[in-house]
């Protein structure tokens, strides 16, 4: 093994040890420590450990934030772990389960070849009265166009997207989450 391989193994081991020790001792870490641990586990592809870190963050009443939450969902999906991405969404407080987090999870499901789950997430999002952005439509349409099972939904989504484009031209205020999903 190379020196870099040993270094990576040691860093992962020490990060796991730090997390386990804090859990065992009942110690709540600072937000930056949780984020550093999550980053180490993401880089080493220890994705289930990332979820453990996020659970502890939530217990310690630290917030991932809208951006980090959506990025985490996206990265877990990129690691081909859609179930962990869905779990990450569930761990977010309701006020952070917004447009960017839902769009990220839809992208995960589309990438995993499960457009029906992406459509279910769209339904949940609409039930919470969160309106899709142009980026949300792009994600859905790119995945649904590859399958013949959702032709009616694809047509409907395309009409909604065109309507949103027309109304967005006259909108003066663009929300942060809309910018993230563009």
Swiss-Prot record:
Q: Does the keyword Ribonucleoprotein apply?
A: no
| Top-level taxon | Eukaryota
Repeat is among the record's keywords: yes
Q: Which InterPro entries match?
A: Pentatricopeptide_rpt, PPR-containing_protein, TPR-like_helical_dom_sf
| Sections of the chain in a coiled coil | none
What PROSITE patterns does the database record attribute to this sequence? PPR
Keyword field: Repeat
Q: Where are the PPR repeats?
A: 30-64, 65-95, 98-132
Pfam families per UniProt: PPR_2
Task: Give the family, as the similarity comment puts it.
Answer: Belongs to the PPR family. P subfamily.
Name the NCBIfam families for this protein: PPR
Please state what the protein is called: Pentatricopeptide repeat-containing protein At2g01360
Q: Which organism is it from?
A: Arabidopsis thaliana (Mouse-ear cress)
């Amino acid at each position: 093994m190379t020196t870099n391989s040993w270094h990576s193994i040691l860093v992962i081991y020490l990060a796991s040890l730090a997390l386990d020790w804090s859990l065992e001792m009942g110690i709540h870490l600072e937000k930056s420590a949780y984020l550093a641990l999550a980053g180490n586990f993401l880089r080493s592809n220890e994705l289930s450990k990332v979820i453990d870190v996020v659970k502890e963050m939530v217990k310690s009443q630290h917030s991932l934030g809208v951006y980090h939450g959506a990025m985490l969902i996206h990265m877990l999906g990129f690691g081909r772990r859609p179930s962990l991405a869905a779990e990450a969404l569930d761990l977010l407080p309701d006020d952070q389960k917004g447009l960017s987090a839902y769009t990220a999870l839809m992208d995960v499901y589309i990438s995993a070849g499960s457009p029906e789950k992406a459509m279910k997430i769209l339904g949940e999002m609409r039930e919470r009265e969160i309106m899709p952005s142009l980026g949300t439509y792009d994600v859905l349409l790119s995945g649904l166009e590859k399958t013949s099972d959702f032709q009616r939904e694809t047509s409907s989504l395309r009409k909604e997207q065109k309507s949103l484009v027309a109304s967005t031209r006259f909108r003066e205020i663009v929300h942060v989450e809309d910018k993230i999903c563009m």
